[in-house]
């Protein structure tokens, strides 16, 4: 037995030297590949990844859930690899506020992802990697144009603003269509009608135009928003495995075609506006941008001058900002109402008490309807249907929570984790609008600000204010007049389908009943 341990394999000096050289080379490559860390900083922790694949298999079909689980193990700042690309993942409200707000200039970039380059030919304000002064100035220009034809007052209308006027009209048309469906079929899929109503609101603001609910041109585009969301969602393999772009890929071909169709639609609308444009007679957002484009003065704003092509890009960005999130929010809201009928009754009791039936709800009623507001906040939190912000990237070498983050690092911001953080919410899986109400029945402002859906900081959604108002007014008008339900025993699938905005499975068993109770009206 002992003789076995005395056996040795002779190694020559040259073999020993070769082995030592190879070992040193491998060690040098590993150290060279790792970033040099400034003194006192660490690299973010994270799970081991497979060669070539990285951690893509860990993400699965629900990356927001997988990364939330990883944050429990590695903390609010962790790093994964998708393919060979390192990705920083941020969780936790304080950490995300630190990055996007207090260190906003460091984290305001966008990664140069392949899917982003397909959106408006890579010239989108929302998806473009550009984050410099020209981008910031054009973003302000787009935001101001949208504000001028949404929350600004319309002197020719009795409504408080353009948005209230458009939503009030579309909500009435929507109610009529739903009741027609009830009379003809006895049930309906609400998403089919909500999507056109919301699209008409943003079309009115951008183009002074609305479409019929059966208009095939509009329907062919807005009903494909799911596919767009899947194409630009965080962790899309196409962005991290370049070889997939050169293999037969029907989904990629469809995504390219969808972007071309959206662009052609917007291009046609802008061209029509040029034909009828009159300086001094600004009708809508597109006219406002055309006016700016034709202003050739060489002043301090010359660097943000919009070309005709850029107008199409900006309008397309605004259409997206004012359409998909609102449609998804209202659709999820109706799902929660039919699965929580007592919540629906409480909202309607509040509407009856505050407004009655003598007039439509207005935006000015919002502060007097705290339970309605609490319901919307809880829908945003519980559904958390924008699980990640659009990916960010760092614009320079920086640090966060003691970790070194190099310039150009792709960053995923996990909004779903914040909205389901047990430390913040106690019972995050429960749908409970009352959590947002104080003892005196008003909105708990501090808690409401912890619901994150529209991003934070310099890349925050430019349509957030409009979206919140639009969701409120649509729901208030609908619930004042009708009650939503599904037949007893109908199973409603609440499982979210992952994408930039997470949709639910379509439900074709919705019903509405015109309300007769609570018809006594307080003074207007």
UniProtKB/Swiss-Prot annotation:
Pfam entry (one): p450
GO biological process: estrogen metabolic process; fatty acid metabolic process; retinol metabolic process; steroid biosynthetic process
Documented EC number(s): 1.14.14.1, 4.2.1.152
SUPFAM superfamilies: Cytochrome P450 (SSF48264)
Keyword Endoplasmic reticulum (UniProt): yes
Binding-site list for substrate: 228
Family assignment from sequence similarity: Belongs to the cytochrome P450 family.
Name by which UniProt lists this protein: Cytochrome P450 1A1
Organism of provenance: Canis lupus familiaris (Dog)
UniProt gene name: CYP1A1
């Amino acid at each position: 037995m002992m003789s076995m341990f005395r056996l040795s394999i002779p190694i020559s000096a040259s073999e020993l030297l070769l082995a030592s050289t190879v070992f040193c080379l491998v060690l040098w490559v590993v150290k060279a590949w790792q970033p040099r860390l400034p003194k006192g900083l660490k690299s973010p922790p994270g799970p081991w990844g497979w060669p070539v694949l990285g951690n893509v298999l860990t993400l699965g079909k629900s990356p927001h859930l997988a990364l939330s689980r990883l944050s429990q193990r590695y903390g609010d700042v962790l790093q994964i690899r998708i393919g060979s690309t390192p990705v920083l993942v941020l969780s936790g409200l304080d950490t995300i506020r630190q990055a996007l707000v207090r260190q906003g200039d460091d984290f305001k970039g966008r990664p140069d992802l392949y899917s982003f380059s397909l959106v408006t030919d890579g010239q989108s304000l929302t998806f473009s990697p550009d984050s410099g002064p020209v981008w910031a100035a054009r973003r302000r220009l787009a935001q101001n144009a949208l504000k001028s034809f949404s929350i600004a007052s319309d002197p020719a209308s009795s409504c408080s603003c353009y948005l209230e006027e458009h939503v009030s009209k579309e909500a009435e048309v929507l109610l009529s269509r739903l009741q027609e469906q009830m009379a003809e079929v006895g049930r309906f899929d609400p998403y089919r009608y909500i999507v056109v109503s919301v699209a008409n609101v943003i079309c009115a603001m951008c183009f002074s135009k609305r479409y019929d609910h059966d208009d095939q041109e509009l329907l062919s585009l807005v009903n494909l928003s799911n596919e767009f969301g899947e194409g630009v969602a965080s962790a899309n393999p196409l962005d991290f495995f370049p070889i997939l772009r050169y293999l037969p890929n029907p989904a990629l071909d469809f995504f390219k075609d969808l972007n071309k169709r959206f662009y052609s639609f917007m291009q046609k609308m802008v061209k029509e506006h040029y034909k009828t444009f009159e300086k001094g007679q600004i009708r809508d957002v597109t006219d406002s941008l055309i006016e700016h484009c034709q202003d050739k003065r060489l002043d301090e704003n010359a660097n943000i001058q919009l070309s005709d092509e850029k107008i199409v890009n900006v309008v397309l960005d605004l259409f997206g900002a004012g359409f998909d999130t609102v449609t998804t929010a209202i659709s999820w809201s109706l799902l929660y109402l039919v699965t929580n009928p007592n919540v629906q009754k409480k909202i309607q009791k509040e509407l009856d008490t505050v407004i009655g039936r003598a007039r439509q709800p207005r935006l000015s009623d919002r502060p007097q309807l705290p339970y309605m507001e609490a319901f919307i906040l809880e829908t945003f939190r519980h559904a958390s249907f924008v699980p990640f912000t659009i990916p960010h990237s760092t614009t320079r070498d920086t640090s966060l929570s003691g970790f070194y983050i190099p310039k150009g690092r792709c960053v995923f911001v996990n909004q779903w984790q914040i909205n389901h953080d047990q430390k913040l919410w106690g019972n995050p899986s429960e749908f409970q609008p009352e959590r947002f109400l104080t003892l005196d029945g008003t909105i708990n402002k501090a808690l409401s600000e912890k619901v994150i859906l529209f991003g934070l900081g310099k890349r925050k959604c430019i349509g957030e204010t409009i979206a919140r108002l639009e969701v409120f007014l649509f729901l208030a008008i609908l619930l004042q007049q009708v009650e939503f339900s599904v037949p007893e025993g109908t199973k409603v699938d609440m499982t979210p389908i992952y994408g930039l905005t997470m949709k639910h499975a379509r439900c074709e068993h919705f019903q509405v009943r015109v309300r007769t109770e609570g018809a006594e009206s307080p003074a207007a």
